[in-house]
Amino acid sequence: MSFIDEAKVFVKGGNGGNGCVSFRREKYIEFGGPDGGNGGDGGSVILEASSAVNTLLFFRYHQHLRAENGKSGSGKKKSGASGRDLVIKVPIGTQVFDSPGGSLIADLSTVGQRYVVASGGKGGVGNAQYKSSTNRAPVYYTLGAVEEEFPIFMQLKVLSDIGIIGMPNAGKSSLLSRCTMSKTKVADYPFTTLEPHLGVARINEYDLILADIPGLIENANEGAGLGHKFLKHIERCSLLLHLIDGSTEDIVGAYKLVSRELAMYSKELSEKREVIVLNKCDMITEEEIVQKKHLLEDYSNKTVVTLSLDDPLNPLLVMLYEMLQKDDIEEESKKFDPFLHVGYNKKKTPKI
């Protein structure tokens, strides 16, 4: 299945049904009076975030979304039926814009979250509503509101705890496969990964979600390579796992290149917490491992983990899990208001 993370669609709420002009016709009742019913409201187009959908592929083949029109009113003061809403499921992390690069109008980030992207038109009014003391037999009615079709633009940013980044062929897909049993394509050539992949690792009854994006090369922020197109998918990550091929000669240069591309793309992305993994250490000597690890630690001032093909991954995953848990605790502490805490009495300001 293709990974489609952008879509342009045209949406239209249903038209309102027309009001009705009708008069009561019944035996022995000479002047029955007006009894025209109101038209029903048109249906709305609604987007709903769902965990059952992973891409925006649906919109490649369904570019016009139209809700059902309301029915017209009828005699005996019967209102027309309202049009049914058109509910479309979208992946969690879908953002809706009014134009390419325009204003954000919705961010569907939780399961079940809904957004009415196109409201249905109001139904018209039947002549029964126009009856008055001065007009006992009105022939007036109103038409239902007609809704216009308009475009919206959707963009998907996948939700994950950890984003795996690095240059092409750094071993990102292999690591994701080992951690999560994700069936990503693995091969010994650059750009094996052509689209983002998600995997879930189970740690202490917690689902750790990892995202692997295509490798970054120099000038990726200007469009070179593949990774720049998918950098948006790690903007929501809490933590970055930066993989570097241990057999690379200029180990610091490789780290600087990817870090620079992140900074050029987004300041927020470059400031995310990061763990550096010196990968493929089975391809170099113990002396080189120690030397390159120290070089990375001295330059980055960040945690550096060494990893070989035969090394168990559980210690790394547990460390990542604990870092995420610490972030959650710190985030909660920032929200803590001592004045709202049970048992704390705010001092009253003395009157002067």
From Swiss-Prot:
Its cofactor is Mg(2+). Monomer. This is GTPase Obg. An essential GTPase which binds GTP, GDP and possibly (p)ppGpp with moderate affinity, with high nucleotide exchange rates and a fairly low GTP hydrolysis rate. Plays a role in control of the cell cycle, stress response, ribosome biogenesis and in those bacteria that undergo differentiation, in morphogenesis control. PROSITE patterns: G_OBG, GTP1_OBG, OBG. Residues 160-327 form the OBG-type G domain. Keywords: Cytoplasm, GTP-binding, Hydrolase, Magnesium, Metal-binding, Nucleotide-binding.
